[in-house]
């Protein structure tokens, strides 16, 4: 499976990565919360988020890259925040490079904070951001199940609702969220079927991802 394909405007992707060696990405609640805060800061301008899970040594997100018009507006807003902004015309902007730069800035920001907090040096994430294209609605549903079932697969908990750092509980809630909750529920028909499928359908991990 190709894990380093371009992140193109208007397409769905499963994005994921792992800590280097035996390191953990998250050692405490503060790390988890800071990661999500910075994800929202860096990635929400370029993508909509449909589901996620954070495990001590890796993470998974299901996202849709925004369309070119939205990406260009985000680029303009971010560029104008700089001391010396240099705004390219839309026809000259490399959209895929812009998207990847946001992920790179996000990982660098988190790594610097993590290293300072835990008195360590060097890389925290392996390789580059891994991603796979999600091509149809059945694949989208299966990816949501895969992501939410990940903590059970890794024996972090026995019930989906017991793992705090996934989007599963947010999907069941009525509280405001940055997630595309309504669209995700619609993929399953309704909330009842969403819950039933999460508890009755098991996804084959070897055929979906190595994490």
Stretches found by the model and what they are:
Residues 1-211:
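Short catalytic/metal-binding and nucleic-acid-binding patches
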């Amino acid at each position: 499976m190709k894990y380093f394909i371009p992140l193109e405007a208007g397409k769905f992707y499963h994005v994921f990565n792992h800590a280097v060696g035996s390191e953990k990405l998250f050692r405490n609640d503060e790390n988890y919360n800071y990661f999500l805060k910075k994800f929202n800061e860096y990635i929400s301008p370029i993508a909509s988020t449909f589901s996620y899970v954070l495990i001590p040594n890796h993470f998974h997100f299901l996202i849709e890259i925004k369309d070119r018009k939205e990406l260009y507006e985000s680029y303009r807003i971010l560029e104008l925040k700089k001391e010396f902004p240099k705004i390219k015309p839309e026809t000259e902007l490399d959209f895929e490079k812009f998207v990847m730069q946001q992920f790179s800035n996000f990982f660098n920001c988190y790594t610097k904070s993590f290293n300072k907090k835990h008195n360590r040096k060097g890389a925290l994430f392996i390789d580059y951001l891994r991603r796979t294209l999600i091509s149809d609605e059945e694949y989208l549903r299966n990816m949501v199940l895969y992501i939410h079932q990940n903590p059970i697969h890794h024996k972090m908990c026995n019930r989906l609702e017991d793992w705090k750092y996934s989007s599963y509980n947010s999907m069941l809630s009525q509280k405001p969220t940055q997630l595309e909750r309504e669209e995700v529920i619609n993929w399953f028909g309704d909330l009842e079927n969403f819950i039933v499928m999460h508890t009755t359908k098991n996804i084959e991990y070897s055929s979906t991802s190595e994490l």
